[in-house]
């Protein structure tokens, strides 16, 4: 049975840390494919605070185009209204009923996942994979993981991987200050940022 994972995010911008996580997940879980899904209108973020969804889509598209096992979906970008994770997973489950489906997210999601819309449905349709995030101790992550597993009666896969010290927020702040960010993002992402004068 094919194994595919959804890797959703705002990707504002996509950076080397995202790609590092994707490669580690690909190898650790022996995945056939990772599907990057740039969020359209995430319910937890104000629309005016994020870059145009089509620009973010292109940043991801060109960042991953050389990797055969990475692909991009425009499902959320084209979707009208808010982008809820459970709807995205239902969409992929509908068109790929006979695959092992995984959903990759930062371990910080464990803190408020009980507030996610239709989380029960999501947990039934995809296996949750979490990776560590800066600012969260291993003890905290494992405690929250156990709490969520007990609540939803589902196992959660934890990827204990060394993280690159980079975040989209940090990159945006560096650009505002005029600092160099070339080593933190894919070259084609950098070119798009320069083209549109983003984050200044």
Curated annotation (Swiss-Prot):
Cited InterPro entries: Cyt_trans-like, NadD/NMNAT, Rossmann-like_a/b/a_fold
GO molecular function: ATP binding; nicotinate-nucleotide adenylyltransferase activity
Catalytic reactions of this protein: nicotinate beta-D-ribonucleotide + ATP + H(+) = deamido-NAD(+) + diphosphate
Keyword Plastid attributed: no
Pathway: Cofactor biosynthesis; NAD(+) biosynthesis; deamido-NAD(+) from nicotinate D-ribonucleotide: step 1/1
Keyword vocabulary terms for this entry: ATP-binding, NAD, Nucleotide-binding, Nucleotidyltransferase, Pyridine nucleotide biosynthesis, Transferase
EC top class, as a word: transferase
UniProt EC number: 2.7.7.18
Protein's GO biological process: NAD biosynthetic process
Keyword Nucleotidyltransferase: yes
Similarity comment: family membership: Belongs to the NadD family.
UniProt function note: Catalyzes the reversible adenylation of nicotinate mononucleotide (NaMN) to nicotinic acid adenine dinucleotide (NaAD).
Designated name of the protein: Probable nicotinate-nucleotide adenylyltransferase
Source taxonomy: Bacteria, Bacillati, Bacillota, Clostridia, Eubacteriales
Gene that produces this protein: nadD
